[in-house]
Structures are given as C-alpha cells and as structure tokens.
Amino acid sequence: MHTLIKGVLEEILEEEVIIEYPKDREHGHYATPIAFNLAKVFKKSPLVIAEELALKISTHKKTQGLFDSVVACKGYINFTLSLGFLERFTQKALELKEQFGSQIKSERSQKIFLEFVSANPTGPLHIGHARGAVFGDSLAKIARFLGHEVLCEYYVNDMGSQIRLLGLSVWLAYREHVLKESVTYPEVFYKGEYIIEIAKKANNDLEPSLFKENEETIIGVLSGYAKDLMLLEIKDNLDALGIHFDSYASEKEVFKHKDAVFERLEKANALYEKDSKIWLKSSLYQDESDRVLVKEDKSYTYLTGDVIYHDKKFKQDYTKYINIWGADHHGYIARVKASLEFLGYDSNKLEVLLAQMVRLLKDNEPYKMSKRAGNFILIKDVVDDVGRDALRFIFLSKRLDTHLEFDVNTLKKQDSSNPIYYIHYANSRIHTMLEKSPFSKEEVLQTPLKNLNAEEKYLLFSALSLPKAIESSFEEYGLQKMCEYAKTLASEFHRFYNAGKILDTPKTKELLKICLMVSLSLTNAFKLLGIEIKTKISAKD
C-alpha cells in the first residue's frame, strides 16, 4: 500500500517522494514534506508549493478513487485514503492470509549469509547470547518472508587455548570430585556445576585406561569430549528459543585451509614479520594498528581463525554477509574487513551488527546467577521462568545496539504493562467475538465495507500497514519496529473494542471484518518474531 501510493505520487510529480505517517491521525493516513525539498528549486514558499501540488494530485486521473482528501497543511501535503481503496486492499490481504506482507523472489532479492551466536562451546548459553540469537533468527525469518535467500550459520570455535582450558578444567574437577584428590586450580579456569557434571559423566563414559595416560593426552581427550557435550547443550538451549541453524562451521575444519589463505595474504603483501610474530597490515584499511596473526610460540591468534573463516564464507559469493557479534567485539570489524580486502573481496559486502548488554531484574533486584554456570544467567533458566515467546518479544523490543534492561516479573502481569500479554489479549478478544457472532467467517469475509467512521477506517489502515513495518524493520535492521507495530495495533484495537458495541449492531459484519484484518496482521507480525499468537487467554496465562 505504501509502495503503491509512493509510486503514484512520483509518477504524477516526477520527483522522488518521501511518504511519512502524520503525527496527528486527524491529518490523514500519509503525509509528504516534498514542498520543503522543492522550495529552493522553485524559489517559493513551501506553503505555496504544497497548495499547488495538492491541487495537482487531487485532480489527477490516477488518484481518482484513491484518496478521500489531499490537503496542504503548513507546507506538508496530507492524504486520507478512500474507503474503496482500503476495502480492495483488505480483500486482497485476507485472501493472502499468512502470506500477507510477503514478497515473491525477484531481481531485487538478495542472497544473504547470516552468522550469529557463534558462542564458544565451553559452557551453556547465557542470557547475553540470547539477544543476538533471537535477533538473528527473526531477521532471517523476515528476510525470507521478503523473498531473500538466507543461510544461517553458527561458527564453532572448537580448537585453541579455550578448548584446552575446558579440558584442563574438567580434568581438575575429575581429580577433585571423582578421585577425591586435593587440587590447585589455575588463576583462570572454567567453573560451575556443569564442569563437575562433565567430569562425572566422563568417568562413566570413557575408558578407565584413559585416566592412566599422561596428563596432556587426558586433557586432549577431555577437551574434545567436553566440547561435544557443550555443543549438544547449546543446540538444546537454542531449540528452547525456537532457533535452528542451517549449518555449523567447525574452526578445526576451517583451519585446514590456513596455508592457502596465508599464501594469498603473502602474495598481496599483507603480512610482515616483527618481534618473532607475523603481522597483518590492517592499518592500511582504517584499522587503528596492525594485528598479530601468528604469535612468538607459533600459535595463532583469535583473529587468524576469523580471517580464514571469512575467506571460506566469501568464496561462496553471497550478495551480503551479516555477522551479529557482541558489542565487545567491535574492535574486530576493521581488522576482519582489512583481511577481506587483502584477499581480494569487497569488504563492503560484510555488515556487522553489534548486540549490546542485557541486564535482567526480578522484583527490581538483579536476576539470580546460575549456580550451575557460575557467574552467568542461563537462557534455560529464564525460558523456564517467563516462557520462550515473552523472552523473544522483550529481546526484540529495543534496538540491538542499545542496552536492554527489564524486570522479568513484568512479563508475568496480565495487564497493559505487559506488552506481549496485551497483544495476545487483543487477538483473544477478536476470536471470542467471532465465536459468539451469529455470522460465519465466510459471511464476514464477503461483506463490503461501506459505512465506516474515521476511527474504524484508521484501525483498518493500521492493520493494512504491516507490509511497511516488515520492510522497514529489515532495511534498517530495526526489528523493534515490528514489536512497536504490534503494540500500537493492539492498543488501537482495544480502544476500538472499548468504544462501543461490535456485536449486535447493523455494522457487525463490517466491524468483524476489520477485526479479522487486525488478527491477521498481529498473527503475521508475531510469526516473523518467532512467536505463536494466542487465540484464547486462560487464567494461567
């Protein structure tokens, strides 16, 4: 609808037209500030230009039946859509059902490689991982809905010092809790009940002869064993959030291509040796300084794995590569992009979205840390506490790059302070009315819309505006727009519901048709957020 209106106006005015929503709904459905943009060109007041353009638009043959009014107001041009136009769009939307707001694959469609979560398999997923996980999953859903091809991948850091430290931590826990030895732990190690659980499980699963081998052999085996268990648990944690990946990329496998990548970097004159280390000349591409790839002891830095992995990704020739990283990784963006340029790729095809910190409260106090994981709040604990859908909604309700703080008890309230409950409640009210109505759904669907007042028309317009919300949320990576859209639409519906009778009036079928449109838009919006909307609210909800 938004795209159609924009296209018609641009054809009439032969200028690029920005379409906005007026701040005051009494000013209409859409507005454009084009007169301000043309004021310098025509050397006239925006107020005069707006009046002239409003007349031109309202009298043009292409707008007949499209608008009820085209009005110049303080330099803006405000548009009120006709009921006939809204009805045609409503009929089409209700026929499309769950595909309303979607787009078919076209030449504008992109091929997107989306990497997210990629947490080290050294422990269970905590709440900090959940935000990027939920965002990435919903972004993929929206992209596919808009006709794009998306591959979702999890990069598994299954080698290096952290995996060895995991094995060492399990070995020390084994000695302390299974062999009952007195153990001195290093300053840095993985702690928490999950490490003890792995140690005890290893005692049952692995051959007793293993524990008679030399310590490095034992640590090596336990590293792989613990890593595999953690990866299984991570997949279970993701499943609890409704998240599934298309593929998991192993760092160990990726590193098999190390020599070929280093050879190409050397040919590109991207490397040099200094202080017994091998450096990447990343400062040539806007990095603050050059970066070490190979340390003095010939071991590899974390960046090296990223460089090789991104080479693997870019060989697959996607239109766009999106990484979702924690905000603490912001310093890695320039260095990874530099490596891509040296390897002959267009680094502008890589977009890195940063997920800011999450702070959970319960009764206005910090949420209790998990004993099992040490100093972390586990995803599983919060999902068990408030439910998957509520957690997904709250994580998506703020921009990814802003800090998020919320009290989980808000998500248990049954009133308007709990946004997800209020949206479910709107849909539940609609389905309850449909059940009570003497009219079948087919009768309602076939009813023409003829007698709607301004408030009813505006509610219908809001429900029909879902496609624009979907498109904007994807283009701006602002998935909070979907949450805001659903909250606003639900609020408008509740206002409409409370304003007067819907059933047992001469307009019942027309009003129920509006309700069906509202329900469809709420359902489709929630589906893209990975949430199943409720048709009935029970006491336990």
Swiss-Prot record:
Kindly list the biological process annotations in GO that this record carries: arginyl-tRNA aminoacylation
The reactions it catalyses are:
tRNA(Arg) + L-arginine + ATP = L-arginyl-tRNA(Arg) + AMP + diphosphate
**What EC designation does it have?**
6.1.1.19
Family annotation (InterPro entries): aa-tRNA-synth_I_CS (IPR001412), Arg-tRNA-ligase (IPR001278), Arg-tRNA-synth_N (IPR005148), Arg-tRNA-synth_N_sf (IPR036695), ArgRS_core (IPR035684), DALR_anticod-bd (IPR008909), Rossmann-like_a/b/a_fold (IPR014729), tRNAsynth_Ia_anticodon-bd (IPR009080)
Return the GO cellular component terms, semicolon-separated.
cytoplasm
- Keywords in alphabetical order: Aminoacyl-tRNA synthetase, ATP-binding, Cytoplasm, Ligase, Nucleotide-binding, Protein biosynthesis
Residues forming the motif 'HIGH' region are 119-129
GO MF annotations for this entry?
A: arginine-tRNA ligase activity; ATP binding
| Gene3D superfamilies per UniProt | Arginyl tRNA synthetase N-terminal domain (3.30.1360.70), HUPs (3.40.50.620), Isoleucyl-tRNA Synthetase, Domain 1 (1.10.730.10)
| Protein localization | Cytoplasm
Q: Which domain of life is it from?
A: Bacteria
Matching NCBIfam families, A to Z? argS
The UniProt entry's sequence similarity note says: Belongs to the class-I aminoacyl-tRNA synthetase family.
The record ties this protein, via HAMAP family, to: Arg_tRNA_synth
- Cross-referenced PANTHER family: ARGININE--TRNA LIGASE, CYTOPLASMIC, ARGINYL-TRNA SYNTHETASE
**Subunit structure and binding partners:** Monomer.
| Listed name of the protein | Arginine--tRNA ligase
Source organism (scientific name): Helicobacter pylori (strain G27)
User: Which gene does this sequence derive from?
Assistant: argS
